[in-house]
């Protein structure tokens, strides 16, 4: 069973849109493109009868059916579709707090686990300085090769951040990881935080 919420206001707005399509049985399909990545986007599309996929979860609502993409469903946990009126008419919003969160566990490949901790624990802190760090590769000796960007590229504190923050966090979370290495060109200082 899906944990997505479609508010009454959103339901009524969508029902009105669907009624204008002149297609009996038309519903909506909710899905996420590139789920579990920083590029994830939550989408709602019209879904004519027969366009739904057999593996979709059908969510029967008062006036129409919402089909939830099976691959996206776990990422739509706690999602809320709402409609708010304003002076310009109104706006449909989709808040899906788990859309960009990778689904990993102890058996996931090491690169997926590293990316998970970079996205959920490390990059949110670096974002306050306008920076981020990305995984480039995991080399054979168990070293994660990382690259800084934004305000972290060229920052005078990058070495401290790498060793005291990033490496310490990753080594605590991923026991088989042996260390991290920075391949950033820190001579580029235009956007550096420090």
From Swiss-Prot:
Binds 1 [4Fe-4S] cluster per subunit. The cluster is presumably bound at the interface of two monomers. [4Fe-4S] cluster binds at residues 152, 155. This is Fe/S biogenesis protein NfuA. The gene is nfuA. Belongs to the NfuA family. Its cofactor is [4Fe-4S] cluster. Gene3D superfamilies: Fe-S cluster assembly (FSCA), HesB-like domain. Homodimer.
